[in-house]
């Protein structure tokens, strides 16, 4: 063991949820309309963007994943707004003396189009995290009809977070 404490930590997060009927389609705290009236299946609101960011934040500090803190076996988290969960995760991060340097996320979905909603997603996330929205990058792509996203069986998100130790 040494006494080295890094100034930066990076975390990677990933989430995917199945598209189903009878559920809302919440991404980045925005209720989107799928052309086939599909939503994301999950214990909470199944917000893949917010979930992948939470996992990236937790992973950067080796704190486990969101299932450790908000297990699907606990009815307390049933249908909960994922932005509420994100606020709890960022509190954990800040209690350890870290701050977000930046977030970069890629949503993978054939439909609906995500780009028109990116700015409001960034606003929702920046308000929850209490950071400038310029620290958040959100991109969207299709999977070119390949894999579960391409077959419109689900929507996924990859996120990377860079944390900086505060003095």
From Swiss-Prot:
Keywords: Isoprene biosynthesis, Lyase, Metal-binding. Disulfide bonds: none annotated. PROSITE patterns: ISPF. It comes from Prochlorococcus marinus (strain MIT 9312). The lineage of its organism: Bacteria, Bacillati, Cyanobacteriota, Cyanophyceae, Synechococcales. Its cofactor is a divalent metal cation. A divalent metal cation binds at residues 15, 17, 51. It is an enzyme of class 4 (lyase). Binds 1 divalent metal cation per subunit. Pfam families: YgbB. This is 2-C-methyl-D-erythritol 2,4-cyclodiphosphate synthase. It comes from the Bacteria. The keyword Lyase applies.
């Amino acid at each position: 063991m040494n006494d080295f404490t890094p100034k930066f930590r990076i975390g990677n997060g990933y989430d995917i949820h199945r598209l189903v009927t009878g559920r809302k389609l919440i991404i980045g705290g925005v209720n989107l309309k799928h052309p086939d009236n599909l939503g994301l299946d999950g214990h909470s609101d199944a917000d893949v963007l917010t979930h992948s960011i939470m996992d990236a934040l937790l992973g950067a500090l080796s704190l486990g994943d969101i299932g450790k803190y908000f297990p699907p076996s606990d009815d307390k988290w049933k249908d909960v707004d994922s932005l509420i969960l994100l606020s709890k995760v960022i509190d954990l991060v800040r209690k350890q003396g870290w701050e977000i340097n930046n977030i970069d996320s890629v949503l993978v979905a054939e439909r609906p189009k995500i780009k028109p909603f990116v700015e409001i997603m960034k606003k929702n996330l920046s308000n929850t995290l209490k950071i400038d929205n310029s620290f958040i990058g959100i991109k969207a792509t299709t999977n070119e009809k390949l894999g579960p996203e391409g077959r419109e069986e689900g929507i996924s998100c990859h996120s990377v977070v860079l944390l900086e130790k505060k003095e």
